[in-house]
Amino acid sequence: MRVLGIETSCDETGIAVYDDKLGLLSHALYSQVKLHADYGGVVPELASRDHVRKIVPLIRQALKNANTEIADLDGIAYTKGPGLIGALLVGACVGRSLAFAWNKPAIGVHHMEGHLLAPMLEDDAPEFPFVALLVSGGHSMLVKVDGIGLYEVLGESVDDAAGEAFDKTAKLMGLDYPGGPRLAKLAAKGEPAGYQFPRPMTDRPGLDFSFSGLKTFTANTIAAEPDDEQTRANIARAFEEAVVDTLAIKCRRALKQTGYNRLVIAGGVSANTRLRETLAEMMTSIGGRVYYPRGEFCTDNGAMIAFAGLQRLKAGQQEDLAVKGQPRWPLDTLPPVA
């Protein structure tokens, strides 16, 4: 089976072709980072318009690179949600229109299921069951995964997600958009400076996350300290360590609660070097393994949507002709794949 995947949930237009026997045949990505940089964040209307401008040329490019004709496709998968409604509707309109014109089945994919399954694009893919840590700009959640569609959300962010906290803290430090990667780069130059940053919600039972208080603590620290490059690097390091430690503590709890010894990390923040190293050390210490996608598949991309959609289309799942976007969509409401 061969599927065209379309991702337009936020500020990246991602298109890919995936074949269940040959693997990933092509993927094309256009990032809107430069477009939104002047505004310090994503402007939804501008994001939607840029998707309109780029999506059809990228589809042509992906099909050409995959040496795939329309007749070779067995289905179309597009991101249905969660995300920015205008951006979602661009991908949904194009995906549904092509499915109708080409007489192909189509399915709307959950964006976070795409991230969750992204490590399965790798040669050394995880087997079920496992615990998944999904960390991105809009989501932080721990999920018990027993199969595709067999999800139990164990904990999630009650305010700012981890990626959002990175971006907002970067802005407080005067770093350009996108802030998260720039803050991590600055933190790599930092030294231990004795800052006692909190590890939010680790002093009580439970697996939920909260990073808004940590962001405020960081803002107060920035205001109280000298404004020089090394001090900012030290504060960035202390902030990053606090976020990573918090995520690691919650992961350990989730693994203990489920009894599983496999951990998947995915989403944009999963590209963070300190997070990967910390979780790898933790899993080694408890005799488990950690899995994550390659860097280019940590951020939003069409490959993960093509793969996730293929699993459901192959199981006979598809949707009607209605164009639908779902900006809010609980992950654990998805049907299982038989």
Curated annotation (Swiss-Prot):
Look up and give the organism this protein is from: Shewanella sp. (strain ANA-3)
Q: What does the entry comment about cofactor binding?
A: Binds 1 Fe(2+) ion per subunit.
Q: Where in the cell is it found?
A: Cytoplasm
Task: Write out the similarity annotation.
Answer: Belongs to the KAE1 / TsaD family.
Tell me the enzyme class: transferase
| Keyword list, A-Z | Acyltransferase, Cytoplasm, Iron, Metal-binding, Transferase, tRNA processing
Q: What is this protein called?
A: tRNA N6-adenosine threonylcarbamoyltransferase
Q: What does this protein do?
A: Required for the formation of a threonylcarbamoyl group on adenosine at position 37 (t(6)A37) in tRNAs that read codons beginning with adenine. Is involved in the transfer of the threonylcarbamoyl moiety of threonylcarbamoyl-AMP (TC-AMP) to the N6 group of A37, together with TsaE and TsaB. TsaD likely plays a direct catalytic role in this reaction.
What are its GO cellular component terms?
cytoplasm
This protein's cofactor list reads:
Fe(2+)
Family annotation (InterPro entries) = ATPase_NBD, Gcp-like_dom, KAE1/TsaD, Peptidase_M22_CS, TsaD
* tRNA processing recorded as keyword: yes
Q: Where does substrate bind?
A: L134, V135, S136, G137, G138, D167, G180, N272
Known EC number(s)?
Answer: 2.3.1.234
Source taxonomy lineage? Bacteria, Pseudomonadati, Pseudomonadota, Gammaproteobacteria, Alteromonadales
The cross-references to Gene3D superfamilies, in alphabetical order and at most eight, read:
3.30.420.40
Amino-acid positions noted as binding Fe cation in the UniProt annotation, renumbered to this chain: H111, H115, D300
GO molecular function annotations of the record:
iron ion binding; N(6)-L-threonylcarbamoyladenine synthase activity
What is one Gene Ontology biological process annotated in the Swiss-Prot or TrEMBL record?
tRNA threonylcarbamoyladenosine modification
Known catalysed reaction(s)?
A: L-threonylcarbamoyladenylate + adenosine(37) in tRNA = N(6)-L-threonylcarbamoyladenosine(37) in tRNA + AMP + H(+)
